[in-house]
């Protein structure tokens, strides 16, 4: 049994021990958070009061001479008492569950911490503050996303000095290999900065649609060959901790060694059911990944977030499909809070590819690197890097939150009868492609049906050529092998 499977079994076992009289919404909140009731209650308690909860225990002598316990905590002057239990830990769990019931019922009143926007706050600090303020605002309408913010990312739109958050996501895990599907409905990479970009895509799709119906109200205008951003518009990315890969691993390498020179710039990838990243230049990783191989137990490989951000600074954030209609769009700045080092981050997302010359209309974006705090503390890392079993996403176009189970990349909910239902995320390949087809229909753009997702991407020939050139260049510079997913992931038909 793997470590992750063992953790899941332990979590399920703990849920089975929950008190029967605890409301379902409390049990569901604990389950979705991936945390034990004591940890979750303590975090919410701190959010509400600014203090750590103090648990007191009282003995209850039984007629047979045995000892049982009751745990009590005070929340905003209210005494919260758990059920009588034979062990102190069980009593504390019971008290925490009762406390969660109180907290969640009052979440809309207490949940949003006071975020101070001071006049001297820097632009990048504003990104951080607005990100957390937005997240806690969303918690008011969906308490189940509490505790998801260990790794959080957001994208901001800046128009002539006015700043607006347009996408926000949390998460630091990905799809398990035994849960893969070939119909484009499952999210593969649920790391926060990756989902924030996909939320940005939803916004960009909505703006392209808006241009087709009311051009003056869209962020786009007509360019020479495609839509381009209007003057004064830029996009900015915030991440609360350094992206996995080069931006993070470089800190651990010894300066001046061959490892430092050779490995600190090389491509790295995430492996399913694993933590951290692996160098992508080894010969055993040259063979393409296969669908049946992953199904049979091979560990799926996904490029690190540092490498994906590097790609975005070369090919744009819009991806292949939107490139049918718009010119490349780049982040103007990337800001990181914990574990940030401006030199490391700059190397990760820009310097490694600075000498690459992509074909027009692409370029290597000299993105501005922002720092939201001075100290790079290890203590913050342990909290920020903790994996969660769920991820949330929000974007301005859709306007509501969505919770995704990272192990299968799907949205899990219950119908009116209480039965479990599973649906694709709005950020998945299939739903994004269907948005593209909607745009083609409204703009009367010819599409040869039936068409696969792979064919739709390949139709953006300039993007495909630039991507191929970039991947070839990376290998020629001995920076490693770009790991591609099996073709089956992109061969599904779009309706």
UniProtKB/Swiss-Prot annotation:
Keyword terms: Chemotaxis, Cytoplasm, Hydrolase, Metal-binding, mRNA processing, Nucleus, RNA-binding, Zinc
Predominant subcellular localization, coarse grouping: nucleus
Gene3D superfamilies from the UniProt entry: 3.30.160.20
GO process annotations (BP): adenosine to inosine editing; chemotaxis; determination of adult lifespan; mRNA processing; positive regulation of chemotaxis; RNA processing
UniProt subcellular location: Nucleus; Cytoplasm
Chain residues that bind Zn(2+): 191, 244, 305
Gene Ontology CC annotation, any one: cytoplasm
Domain DRBM: 36-105
Residues annotated as domain A to I editase: 167-492
InterPro entries with a match to the protein in the record: A_deamin, dsRBD_dom
Keyword Metal-binding in record: yes
EC id: 3.5.4.37
Enzyme active site: 193
Catalysed reactions listed for this entry: adenosine in double-stranded RNA + H2O + H(+) = inosine in double-stranded RNA + NH4(+)
One GO MF term: metal ion binding
Miscellaneous: Can prevent somatic transgenes from inducing gene silencing via the RNA interference (RNAi) pathway. This may occur due to A-to-I editing of transgene-derived dsRNA, preventing transgene RNAi.
Assembly and oligomerization: Interacts with A-to-I RNA editing regulator adr-1. Interacts with adbp-1; the interaction facilitates adr-2 nuclear localization.
Role noted for this protein: Catalyzes the hydrolytic deamination of adenosine to inosine in double-stranded RNA (dsRNA) referred to as A-to-I RNA editing. Acts primarily on non-coding regions of protein-coding genes including introns and untranslated regions (UTR). Required for normal chemotaxis. Edits the 3' UTR of clec-41 which is required for normal clec-41 expression and for chemotaxis. Plays a role in determining lifespan. Not required for RNA interference. Likely to play a role in determining whether a dsRNA enters the RNAi pathway.
Protein's name in the database: Double-stranded RNA-specific adenosine deaminase adr-2
Phylogenetic lineage: Eukaryota, Metazoa, Ecdysozoa, Nematoda, Chromadorea
């Amino acid at each position: 049994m793997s470590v992750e499977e063992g953790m899941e079994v332990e979590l399920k076992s703990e849920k089975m021990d929950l008190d029967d009289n605890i409301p379902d919404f409390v049990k569901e909140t604990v389950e979705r958070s991936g945390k034990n009731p004591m940890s979750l209650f303590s975090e919410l308690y701190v959010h509400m009061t600014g203090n750590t909860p103090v648990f007191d225990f009282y003995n209850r002598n039984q007629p047979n001479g045995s000892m049982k316990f009751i745990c009590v905590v005070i929340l905003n002057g209210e005494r919260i008492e758990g059920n009588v239990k034979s062990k102190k830990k069980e009593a504390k769990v019971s008290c925490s569950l009762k406390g969660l019931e109180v907290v969640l019922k009052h979440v809309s009143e207490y949940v949003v911490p006071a975020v101070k926007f001071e006049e001297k706050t820097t632009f990048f600090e504003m990104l951080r503050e607005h990100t957390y303020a937005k997240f806690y605002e969303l918690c008011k309408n969906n308490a189940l996303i509490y505790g998801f913010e260990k790794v959080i990312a957001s994208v901001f739109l800046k128009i002539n000095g006015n700043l607006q958050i347009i996408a926000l996501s949390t998460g630091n895990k990905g799809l398990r290999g035994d849960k893969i599907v070939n119909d484009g409905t499952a999210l593969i990479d649920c790391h926060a900065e990756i989902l924030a970009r996909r939320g940005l895509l939803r916004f960009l799709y909505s703006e392209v649609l808006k241009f087709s119906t009311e051009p003056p109200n869209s962020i786009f205008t007509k360019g020479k060959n495609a839509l381009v951003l209007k003057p004064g518009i830029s996009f900015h990315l915030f991440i609360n901790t350094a992206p996995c890969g080069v931006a993070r691993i470089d800190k651990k390498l010894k300066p001046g060694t061959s490892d430092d020179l050779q490995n600190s710039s090389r491509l790295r990838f995430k492996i399913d059911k694993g933590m951290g990243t692996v160098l992508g230049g080894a010969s055993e990783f040259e063979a393409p990944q296969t669908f049946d191989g992953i199904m049979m137990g091979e560990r799926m490989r996904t490029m690190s977030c540092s490498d994906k951000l590097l790609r975005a600074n070369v090919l744009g954030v819009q991806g292949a499909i939107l490139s049918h209609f718009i010119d490349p769009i780049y982040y103007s700045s990337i800001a990181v809070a914990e574990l940030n080092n401006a030199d490391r981050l700059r190397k990760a997302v820009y310097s490694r590819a600075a000498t690459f010359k992509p074909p027009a209309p692409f370029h290597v974006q000299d993105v501005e690197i922002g720092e939201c705090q001075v100290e790079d503390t290890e203590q913050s890392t342990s909290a920020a890097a903790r994996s969660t079993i769920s991820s949330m996403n929000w974007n301005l176009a859709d306007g509501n939150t969505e919770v995704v189970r990272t192990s299968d990349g799907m949205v899990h909910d219950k119908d009116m009868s209480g039965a479990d239902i599973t649906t694709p995320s709005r950020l998945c390949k299939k739903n994004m492609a269907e948005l593209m087809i909607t745009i083609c229909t409204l703009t009367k753009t010819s599409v040869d049906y039936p068409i696969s997702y792979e064919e739709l991407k390949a139709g953006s020939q300039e993007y495909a050529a630039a991507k191929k050139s970039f991947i070839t260049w990376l290998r020629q510079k001995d920076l490693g092998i770009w790991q591609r997913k099996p073709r089956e992931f992109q061969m599904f038909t779009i309706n």
